[in-house]
Amino acid sequence: MAKSDIHPKWYPEAKVYCNGQVVMTVGSTKPELHVDVWSGNHPFYTGTQKIIDTEGRVERFLRKYGMSSTQTSGEQNKK
């Protein structure tokens, strides 16, 4: 026999916010979702290259291994 009332509440019109603006509505177990990146501003979909680093990990890696942040990946791979 199945248990009753074990499933979370479902919100079929949950709003997804990015930078304070509603970007889409989806079905979710939460009424509102706040995201930093979505398909409208993701570098893969927009064709731009951007490093999203909120904790300074990229800079720490570059300092640790003596790389400058101005190098591109193509320049690093050349021998």
From Swiss-Prot:
Keywords: Ribonucleoprotein, Ribosomal protein, RNA-binding, rRNA-binding
UniProt GO molecular function: rRNA binding; structural constituent of ribosome
GO annotation terms (biological process): translation
Keyword RNA-binding: yes
A GO cellular-component term linked to this record: ribonucleoprotein complex
Source species, domain of life: Bacteria
Subunit structure: Part of the 50S ribosomal subunit.
PANTHER family linked: 50S RIBOSOMAL PROTEIN L31, CHLOROPLASTIC, LARGE RIBOSOMAL SUBUNIT PROTEIN BL31C
Role summary: Binds the 23S rRNA.
Stated family: Belongs to the bacterial ribosomal protein bL31 family. Type A subfamily.
Protein name: Large ribosomal subunit protein bL31
Native source organism of the sequence: Trichormus variabilis (strain ATCC 29413 / PCC 7937)
